[in-house]
Amino acid sequence: MSRRLAATSLLLALVLVAAGRAQPSRRPKYGGTLRVEIGAVVNSPDLAVSAANSNEAFAKNEIAALLYDHRNPDGTFAGVPGSGPFRISEWEPGKRAVLAANENYRGGRPFVDSVEIQMGRSARDRLLDLELGKADVAEILPEEARRASERGMRVSTSEPDELLAVVFVSGRPPAEDARAREALARSIDRAAIVNFILQKEGEPAGGLLPQWSSGTAFLFSTSPDAPAAKDLWAQIGGSPKIVLGYDASDPLEQSVAERIVVNAREAGIAISAEANANAASSPAKDGARLMRLRMISPYPREALMDFVAVLGPIVGPDTSPLQENAAAQQIYEREREIVSSYRVVPLVWLPQVYGLGARVRNWKAPAAGEGWPFTDVWLEENPQ
């Protein structure tokens, strides 16, 4: 009897301890302004106005996803601005935007009353504002993710869904020489780009789709082959030179371009890297340029067909869409056909990285094709 009493007493004590440690449940709350900081400068929310660079194009699409009712499978937006979860209440071109919650949104009103977006903030200032509690959500460069986490910040990292690639410009020598294209492709040390430039926050890319999406990325080599690159380049007469363009406003592209130049020159390739003020076009001297391609869908067929549409004739004569029920083998064969031309040279896959403030609740890292998850985020009044 005493043993039963002792066991009961012990059980009761454990229950009381557990109850004392239990935290009160947190329920979603409406209200507040979500403070967001980004590096891009968006001059106009109008989708008809072209973006000056890839960073502005991405931010513009993210904002549009909050303003329109929904996004179609092909990535276009449906409805009119303001039919989505938010509407524009203030817009200072290139500096600041305030989006107010749409009370009549068919998907339900967002939890926050508004989203304030500060544009053109430097990477350093974004991290500092997160630490000081002046920002709730801020973009973090992939190469800064590990350092931010070590400093105790909440860091959200998505699946790698943005491809950084070298794209050869049609009609410009030596881009029209297949040996030159292959030589450059084989000279690049992708692992070094991931390990040293990206600080291991990314993946080497040999194909146009990531492993988590297609399941066949491992079939594409990502290893450098400097001897083969040197042999290919030696076959080309006339000592051609490749000019590799990159976005002048993108420090990551600059670092990658400079690394490619080092690798290529070690293989005897004549190459130089030059900054372009307008990433939307390539100067006549550029034979190749760095390009960012973001997946519009986690599904391999949809993502690959979007890349084909964006790249156009660069990928080759066959730009016809794959059937909706295309088998994995068919998707792989089309991908292999494009990569084997060396007109598009995949380099690395990049994730979306965000730093989160203490007030932010219910954040979910966006999947490929998804926009900023501000509709479902709510703010804790007194975070612990």
Q: Language-model segments: what does each one mean?
A:
Residues 37-83:
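N-terminal lobe/hinge region of extracytoplasmic solute-binding protein
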Residues 356-384:
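Long beta-strand-rich cores associated with HINT superfamily self-processing modules
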